[in-house]
């Protein structure tokens, strides 16, 4: 039996700012829907928390410490049935500098 392979573009987005990430996802989904492709997402992935522990004083006081954290928010957007218009529109899309984008065809 021959199975029909469906074309799919998977876009992974990462950012420290959740609102910036959500607006970028909205732009991608709107662009895909405008060009006739089907967009599924944004699908939220687990947020990674990275905690850094530093000594407050430069000398002996080991009991006094300060904690800092960074949170990396992640989303996935799947685009099914992309046309050449969809790919061109996604390449021309202007997204903020704080969002890391990874595209798989």
UniProtKB/Swiss-Prot annotation:
Involved in the binding of tRNA to the ribosomes. Part of the 30S ribosomal subunit. GO terms for cellular component: ribonucleoprotein complex; ribosome. NCBIfam families: PRK00596.1, rpsJ_bact. The gene is rpsJ. One of its GO terms (molecular function) is tRNA binding. One of its GO terms (biological process) is translation. It comes from Trichodesmium erythraeum (strain IMS101). The keyword Ribosomal protein applies. Belongs to the universal ribosomal protein uS10 family. Transmembrane segments: none annotated. The keyword Ribosomal protein applies. This is Small ribosomal subunit protein uS10. It comes from the Bacteria.
């Amino acid at each position: 039996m021959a199975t029909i392979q469906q074309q799919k573009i998977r876009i992974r987005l990462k950012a420290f700012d959740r609102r910036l990430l959500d607006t970028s996802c909205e732009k991608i989904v709107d662009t895909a829907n405008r060009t006739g492709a089907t967009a599924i997402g944004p699908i939220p992935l687990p947020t990674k928390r990275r905690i850094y522990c530093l000594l407050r004083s430069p000398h002996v006081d080991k009991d006094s410490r300060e904690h800092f954290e960074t949170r990396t928010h992640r989303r996935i957007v799947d685009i099914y049935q992309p046309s050449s218009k969809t790919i061109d529109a996604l390449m021309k899309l202007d997204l903020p500098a704080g969002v890391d984008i990874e595209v798989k065809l």
